[in-house]
Amino acid sequence: MISFESDYNNGMLPEILEALGKTNSDKTSGYGFDPYSESAKEKIRKAVDNENAEVFFLIGGTQTNTTVIDSVLMGCEGVICVETGHIEVHESGAVEAFGHKVITLPGKNSKLTTGTLSAYMDTFLADESHPHMVQPGMVYISMPTEFGMVYTREELAALYATCQKYDLRLFIDGARLGYGLVSAACDYDLPFLAKHCDVFYIGGTKVGAMMGEAVVFSGMKAPKYFFTNVKRHGALLAKGRMLGIQFDTLFTDELYFKISRHAIAMATRIRSIFEKHGIAIAYDSPTNQQFVVLSPALYEALSPKVAFEIWERKSEHEIICRFVTSWATKEEELDELNHILQAYA
């Protein structure tokens, strides 16, 4: 069976495995206070073009989201995101478990617009009883979005300006950041993104690492006791160098972006294969997540041979399915998918 189920169903990049093996016998301090982690942090500061950026390594995406949100917000504050936002739909209520309401707004193509945000904030502030409500303190977006969409340069700049207008912190979930930044739809680079948010993270788990995310405070200072809060949230790895080594490797010779470009090339081809066989594209995603519309019959025919995910049962005749590429996707796997589809053309 070939698999396009997710971008974290392989182990890790061979380069990372090699680096971990070479350093296995080293003895270093724990919790990220080691030379490998320091080297990785310095490389990330250089990559974001901000020598004052504060960088922290956490073990996973959900832990990262809850830790950042809980650390930045006061107890009475909530976080705004679109209705399809990852923290709203796919994190088991983790943010709210730490006492912060997720305030959902409708998105446009899975993105939050400045118009929607401004309208909500104006209405909220005009309500005389708003001091009795959960106070919006942060905006959360993901880049790319849950549907693989990319915020443009203009959209991101406008959204950050709107957040600043209403004294909201902007937090960007970058679990798949590499794939978003190298896509043809993205008209900016990592330094631009870092300058147009308060805090973001660089995803490792879904972009070649065994595990780990790198939180970067680029537009604000890290909250007091952030490191302690990382541990409180269960996101601190005792053998912290394991994360440092991985990000040090990813940010050597632009490996992070090279593997992301490979995934995008594979996604572009997988889309063309579906289109060649007359299979409709559900969402115009320019990144490594591709969404197609399958009939129940085609779904049943593909399932024993190809691993992928049902995204939405749109109707009794249409099933939206997600196919995901990664650093590990091989041309031969796409050839096999094409061959399988030919039998049902």
Please describe what each predicted stretch is.
Residues 13-61, 83-88, 94:
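Conserved N-terminal alpha-helix of the aminotransferase class I/II PLP-enzyme fold
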Residues 99-137, 141-144, 151-158:
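PLP-dependent aminotransferase-class I/II
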